[in-house]
Regions:
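Short, amphipathic C-terminal "tail helix"
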Residues: 302, 314-335
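Hydrophobic, well-ordered secondary-structure elements that form the walls
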Residues: 252, 306, 323
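N-terminal amphipathic/basic leader segments beginning at the initiator methionine
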Residues: 1-26
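Mobile late-domain/C-terminal helix-loop "cap" segments
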Residues: 259, 263-312
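Mg2+-dependent prenyl diphosphate-binding active-site environment of isoprenoid biosynthetic enzymes
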Residues: 28-264, 328-331
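An amphipathic alpha-helix signature
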Residues: 16, 20, 56, 119, ...
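Non-transmembrane, amphipathic alpha-helical segments
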Residues: 3-7, 42, 110, 174-179, ...
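A non-catalytic, amphipathic alpha-helix used as a structural packing/dimerization or gating element
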Residues: 10, 14, 143, 189, ...
Length: 335
C-alpha cells in the first residue's frame, strides 16, 4: 500500500462516523425511511473518501489544524454523494460498487429527492459550522458554489454530446469537460478549501488548487482507462459501460482521430449495446490505435506537473508527502 492508501485506511472510519451524524430521521419518522436512510446507505457505499480527506491534508500542509476543516470536508463529500446519485440517473446506470443504484433500489423520485438533500447539505454544513468565522465561511461557500457550477457545466457537456450523437470532438473538448466535471470537485476545490481554512497564503491556496486540478484530471482519465481494461470485479462499477453509453472519453476521442477502423468504432459507440463481443471489439480497436497508452501517458504527465506544483506550494512535511503519494495513487489505482 502507498502512504496515501494507508492514510485513507487509517482515517476513513472516523470520517464515516462523522458523516453519519448528518443523516438523522428529520421531523417525521418516515423521513428516515424515504430520505435520510437511503441517503445514508448510499453515502456509506460511495467510495474511498479521498476528497474530504485531502481537504484535511491541505489544511495541515499549510500549518492549520485539520480538525477545523472537518465540516467543510463533509460538505465536499455531500456534493460527491449528490453528484453520484444524479449521475447514475442521468446515465441510466444499474449498479454502483456492487450495489443497486439508489434509483433502482428506491425508485426515481426518492433518488432525485435524496440527491437534492445532499446538495442542500453542501452549503448548510458550512453555514452551521461553529468553528469558522464569517469571512472564512464566505470564502469557503464561494468555492463550493463555483465547484458545483463547474461540475454541472461539465456534466452538461457530457450528457449533451451523448444526446446529440456528437463525435466531432477534440482532445481539448474532452479536457474542458473532464476538468469541469471531475477535476474541480475531486482535487482543486477540496485542496483550496483546506488551505483557506488552514490559513494558507493566497499563493499556497492557488498552487494547491493547481496541484489538485492536474491530479483530479488524471484521476478522471484513469477512471476512463479502468472502465476499459480493468475487470468488473476490480472496478466495482459497470465495466465497459463507457462504450455501451457511447461516452466521449479521452481514449474514445483519440481512437476516433487515429484508428484505422474508425468507422467501425463509431458504429459500436453509436449502438449503445452492452454485448460483450462488441465491447471487446471496441477495446481492440482502441488498443490498436495506441489510444489507451496515450491516455495513460497523458495522466502520468499530469501527475508530474501536479507534483512539481506541490513542491512550490508548501514546505516539506508529512502532509506534503501524503499529497504527493495521493497524486501517484490516482494513476496507479486499480479501482
Amino acid at each position: 500500500m502507498t502512504g496515501f492508501e494507508l492514510y485513507l485506511k487509517a482515517n476513513t472510519r472516523a470520517f464515516d462516523r462523522y458523516l453519519s451524524t448528518f443523516f438523522t430521521d428529520g421531523t417525521h419518522p418516515d423521513m428516515g425511511r424515504y430520505l435520510y436512510g437511503p441517503l445514508k446507505q448510499f453515502s456509506d457505499n460511495s467510495g474511498k473518501r479521498h476528497r474530504p480527506l485531502i481537504c484535511l491534508l491541505a489544511c495541515e500542509a499549510v500549518g492549520g489544524d485539520p480538525k477545523q476543516a472537518w465540516p467543510a470536508a463533509a460538505a465536499v463529500e455531500h456534493f460527491h454523494t449528490a453528484a453520484l446519485v444524479h449521475d447514475d440517473i442521468e446515465d441510466s446506470s444499474l449498479t454502483r460498487r456492487d450495489e443497486p443504484c439508489m434509483h433502482i433500489a428506491e425508485g426515481l423520485g426518492i433518488a432525485i429527492n435524496a440527491g437534492d438533500l445532499a446538495l442542500a447539505l453542501v452549503c448548510g454544513t458550512v453555514v452551521h459550522d461553529p468553528g469558522l468565522d464569517d469571512p472564512t465561511k464566505i470564502r469557503v461557500l464561494a468555492e463550493l458554489v463555483d465547484m458545483t457550477t463547474r461540475t454541472i457545466e461539465g456534466q452538461a457537456l457530457d450528457i449533451g454530446w451523448a444526446r446529440d450523437g456528437r463525435f466531432d470532438l477534440t482532445v481539448d473538448d474532452y479536457l474542458t469537460m473532464a476538468n469541469h466535471k471531475t477535476a474541480f470537485y475531486s482535487g482543486g476545490v477540496p485542496l483550496a478549501i483546506g488551505a483557506i481554512i488552514g490559513g494558507g497564503s493566497t499563493a499556497q491556496v492557488e498552487t494547491l488548487r493547481a496541484f489538485g486540478m492536474a491530479a483530479g484530471l488524471a484521476f478522471q482519465i484513469q477512471d476512463d482507462v479502468l472502465n476499459l481494461v480493468g475487470t468488473r470485479e476490480s472496478t466495482k462499477k459497470d465495466f465497459r459501460s463507457d462504450i455501451a453509453e457511447g461516452k466521449r472519453t479521452l481514449v474514445a476521442i483519440h481512437a476516433l482521430q487515429h484508428a484505422d477502423r474508425r468507422e467501425r468504432l463509431l458504429e459500436i459507440l453509436s449502438t449503445h449495446s452492452d454485448d460483450p463481443v462488441l465491447l471487446d471489439e471496441a477495446v481492440e480497436i482502441m488498443q490498436a490505435a495506441d489510444s489507451i497508452a496515450f491516455a495513460r501517458d497523458y495522466a502520468h504527465d499530469l501527475i508530474v506537473e501536479a507534483k512539481a506544483c506541490l513542491v512550490d506550494a508548501v514546505p516539506a512535511s508529512r502532509a506534503r508527502d501524503l499529497l504527493a503519494s495521493m497524486a501517484d495513487f490516482f494513476v496507479k489505482r486499480s479501482s
